[in-house]
């Protein structure tokens, strides 16, 4: 990544270039951490493409919720997936799962579905297909930046509002 390049060029050079170190990085990292990467890949892909509840994840993956739950717990312990509950609630049936790591979230959301195009060296076409969805992807990134900023302001004594935790509600 380079701050001298546009977002488009950075994405093309890193994620849409088969010669880039990041092109296969999430899959390679996962293979180092788990014994059965296929089901883990399927779960991460399901979450990256919109499944957020355990029933939705298991439906997309084609496995029972019990099996998926065990794999999701491992992904949580690896810091790849996170479980969120609505702000102010303890354990909740409203819990949702999301990809915690921005690189994993981007890669699993956009690279696999464009893999054939990328493999043929058509980074421009792949980017053209990705670009309309970048603002959706950046929504969660922006939320996280805002949370980090608020915590920094609070800890430095510069936040006009007192709080002890931050979260989302749905």
What do these predicted regions represent?
Residues 1-105, 109:
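Interdomain hinge/linker elements that couple catalytic modules in large macromolecular machines
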